[in-house]
Every structure is written in C-alpha cells, then in structure tokens.
Design a protein with these regions (language model features):
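Substrate-binding/active-site clefts of carbohydrate-active enzymes
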Residues: 135-315, 323-349
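Polar, glycine-rich mid-to-C-terminal structural blocks
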Residues: 342-345, 352-367
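Generic enzyme active-site microenvironment
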Residues: 131, 243, 320, 356
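N-terminal structural segment of carbohydrate-active enzymes
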Residues: 1-219, 233
Length: 367
C-alpha cells in the first residue's frame, strides 16, 4: 500500500510505501505534512474479480478514515478499476484491469485540524423531543431572510432566521438528511442527474462539501468542517439538538462492476458482503448495489469509529440509521444481538445519544 501526497495545484504525486501487513495492518510514520495536505492511497495486490479482488495501483483511493475531502468524484472510465467503455459498461468478461490514473478524477482526502470547541449538547429528554427532519440544501431555499449566498448551506441552517423558525415551531431536534460526503451513482450520471438525497456515501467521516457556503468551499476542506461545527454550536446554543440520518449499510461504489473509489480498491471482500459460492457477486440487501459486511470486525470498527467521531468531534446528538436491519445482519440473517448493535448500546459515548432505527431492508426477512 502506498500513501500518496498530492499537490492540488500541479497534480504532482509523492508516494511512500507503507510497512506491513502486520496482523493485517499497513503502517508508517511520515513527518513534515501540514494541515491542508491532499493525500490518498494506492493498493497493490492480485487482480482477480472472480474472487472479488480489484487491486489496481492506477487508482487513487479515498482514505476511509479521512476527516477532510477535497473535490468531487467525476464518474468516468478512469475511476473504474476495470476497463469500461464510454457508457461505463465493461469492455470484456472476464474483467480486465484499467491502466489509466484516477487521481485527477477522484476526490482527495485532506489533513484537517480536529480541535474545535462545540457548545455543549442540549440533552433534551426523549419524552420531550420534537424532531424536524430536513435537507440542508432545501430547507432555506425559500427563506427570504437568509442571504442568497447562504441558502442551502450549513451556515444558512445556522442563520438567525432559520433558528427562529425552528424555535417558533417548538422543535427541539433537527434530523439532517445524509450529510456524509457523497458521490452520484453512475446510472444517474448517464441521465444527467444528481443524487439530491445523499444516500450514497463516499466518506463516513467527512461532511458533504457542496452543502457549505461558497466562501467556505473556496477556503478549502478545513473551512467546510468549521462551518459545519459552527452550525452545530449555534443550534446547540438555541437548545436544538442535531441528529444525523446515516447510511452505514452501503456505499457509493455500487454493484459488482461499479467504480473503485475507496473500499473496493483497498479490500473489497472484507468490506462488502459476498456469497461463499460466488465471491465475485456482492450480496445486496439495500437495493443500492452493495452491502457493507458487518460480519467483519474491521467493518464494525469503521462504523463505531465514525459514530464516535461525529459525537466527540462534531457535536452530534443522535443518529437515524438508514436500513438498520442491514447493519444488524450476519450472512445468516438479522439478529438484535449483533455485535455492532450491542456495541452501540454499551459504548459510553454513543449510549448517551438518541439512536433511531429504520427497521427494515430488502434482504430475506427484512420486512
């Protein structure tokens, strides 16, 4: 595995080979990188799509734990690990590895400062909670009191007019439709459409940059994160909790022949649930092309670490879990005693938050 540092202005890339794997971990200590550094990973390994293996060092991969994100994914042939035509369909079977570099067309992970003091959480009792579900981009679009340059942004949601409106309604908690950094699905791109709702996660740690104000986006990922944290603090000051609608059941990498942006290129069989008989085939209990493999302890850790980060560093007060039945599944089916669900309830940080489940998925017994 290579740790790749990228100059965002020139595209020049410096690669550092990591050591390992030691007990499954690739590691290294690299000094001299400042806040704002752009980076990603490249992973080498066997090319064997029939076994679910899509290692291709030509593909720059987003850090699954990256806190900041610069740019957006450009869905085009270069971001596929296998060769595809202009319509993004495989040019051959068996799949052949792509030889083009994806770095100019994938988002970049960015080093950011995580130290930020957020106003303490309101801790509204459950029996007094009034939740208002909203989309950050849509909520303020028609609010004349919010400046046009702030409408549809984190800063717009924190504007006094927005806060006053929520307080007048008696709202105690806002539930934000997905704000994790996202990418559009290929079938939408083919039709000239975008994923407005955001149930297509690219990064479980980074807020979606397009929901920040133009001024924040121009200053970079740190400013985007600071705007989000500032929004949370202002809402907390008004006594309003912030709950996130989160999508830990699948990612934006789609199905068996989707793009390779992050997890697929790092270890697809580990991160995505597959069949034992046909490991080339991803099991889909989400209706979105793939399913995160919560059989695996590393996937459980990824989800728990993400949840803790949003509470401890971003001030979040609770979560609504999209297709929650999926994250409580083993390969044999759903169980309320799944280790991930038990860990959420036992975690000293998470158990103090509001945890809301969408209690179904499209898998066997998911209704």
């Amino acid at each position: 595995v290579d740790f790749c540092v990228i100059d965002p202005d020139t595209g020049f890339e410096q690669r550092y080979r990591l050591l390992g794997p030691d007990q499954g971990i690739w590691h290294g200590h690299i000094e001299g990188f400042s806040l704002g550094t752009h980076y990603g990973f490249r992973a080498q390994g066997p090319w064997d799509p029939d076994a679910g293996l899509f290692f291709n060092e030509n593909k720059l991969l987003v850090d699954p734990y990256g806190r900041g994100l610069a740019g957006a994914v450009d869905i085009r042939p270069e971001v596929y690990a296998h060769q595809v035509d202009e319509d993004l369909y495989p040019v051959s079977y068996p799949l052949e590895p792509s030889t083009t570099d994806s770095a100019p067309f994938n988002a970049h992970s960015v080093v950011i400062d995580t130290s930020f003091r957020i106003t303490p959480q309101p801790k509204v009792p459950l029996d007094e909670t009034v939740i208002y579900e909203l989309h950050v981009k849509g909520f303020t679009q028609n609010m004349s009191e919010v400046p046009p340059n702030l409408r549809g942004t984190y800063a717009g949601l924190a504007h006094p007019a927005s806060v006053r409106y929520l307080k007048e309604l008696g709202v105690t908690s806002v539930e934000l439709l997905p704000i994790h950094a996202k990418s559009d699905e290929p079938f939408l791109v083919e039709r000239g459409l975008t994923n407005y709702w955001g149930y297509s996660t690219l990064s479980f740690f980074s807020p979606e940059p397009s929901y920040a104000s133009a001024a924040a986006r121009a200053r970079g990922p740190q400013a985007v994160i600071d705007e989000f944290r500032g929004m949370v603090s202002i809402l907390h000051e008004a006594g309003i909790e912030v709950i996130l609608d989160v999508v830990y059941n699948h990612t934006c990498e789609s199905g068996d022949t989707g793009p390779t942006l992050s997890l697929r290129g790092l270890d697809s069989p580990l991160y995505y649930r597959r069949t034992d008989t046909y490991p080339s085939q991803i099991i889909d209990t989400t209706g979105c092309g793939n399913t995160l493999n919560t059989d695996n302890p590393q996937v459980i850790s990824l989800i728990l670490d993400s949840l803790r980060y949003w509470v401890a560093s971003m001030g979040i007060d609770g979560f609504r879990f999209d297709l929650a039945a999926t994250i409580g599944r083993f390969s044999t089916g759903f169980t309320p005693l799944h280790p991930l669900l038990i860990a959420m309830g036992a975690d000293p940080l998470l158990r103090e938050t509001k945890l809301i489940a969408e209690p179904w998925d499209v898998g066997l017994g998911g209704w």
